Amino acid sequence: MPDTAQHILTLSCPNRPGIVAAVATCLFEHGCNILDAQQFDSIETGQFFARIVFDRVGETAKYEALRTDFSRVAQDFGFKWLMRPRAEKKRVMILVSKSDHCLVDLVYRWRIGELDMAPVGIIANHPRETYAHIDLDGIPFHYLPVTRETKMEQEADVWRLIREAQADVVVLARYMQVLSDGLAAKLSGRCINIHHSFLPGFKGAKPYHQAHARGVKLIGATAHYVTSDLDEGPIIEQDVETISHRDTPDDLVRKGRDIERRVLARALRKHLEDRVLLDGQKTVVFAD
């Protein structure tokens, strides 16, 4: 381990006086230098949230001593906390169906270094030939077809691949299969979905065509954590785009794809950088 290494610390707990002082003192006593610190006090829930980036100077043993001492502080205040090397890449499994715009975008952003992650696999319910035009850059590809009769067996295989790859994060990149309550619970807080939001009245097939028929003036997308409540998990990122009466259904589909890919990428990046903390059914998202 290098003599100087940046680390990220995130924490949440019931709010009370002395939290910041205790954290800062512990880091200082172990020779750490705080580079960035953000915090939020939720008046509604009474919870305190913080994200701290710090430099650590010392050997591995000293780092373990820091973690040991910090765990005592965490116990005193009731922290839910994570401390990890900033350079450590989260392992990401991507699930996709026929629409590949989000998959293409995520792979491209990873390839150019915009998404600092370690892709461990792509699971699709369509064969590799469907994505023949995409250079997956060596990411393992798993074809798991699904029918109504085989859905539970297929989902068991999905979970097996996630476990075997030791994936930290699962991304539903326009994966058009609804996860069971059981799998959603297993992936709680680490499975991100992209949904065509701002179209709440248009469910089912061809939502953008339905929106066009109603003459909407805005379309958008929402990236959220997956829960057992379909498309109602804690929101991470959203965006919208203005629609004109001149726009055709194809225009709405095109604009919708663009919004979906950029919203999903932003949400994933924030998760990878530990900027998202859960606050009940909501999220606290610290700015970059």
Residue ranges and their predicted role:
Residues A24-F28, R109-I112:
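Short, solvent-exposed amphipathic alpha-helical segments in soluble enzyme
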Residues F40-D288:
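One-carbon transfer enzymes
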Residues F28-I34, A74-G78:
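Short secondary-structure junctions
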Residues A21-A22, R266:
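Alpha-helical macromolecular-interaction surfaces
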Residues D3, E29, E44-G46:
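Solvent-exposed loop and beta-edge segments used for protein-protein assembly and interaction
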Residues P2-P14:
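Short glycine-/aliphatic-rich beta-strand segments at the starts of folded cytosolic domains
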Residues N33, Q39-F40:
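Short edge beta-strands and adjacent turn/loop segments
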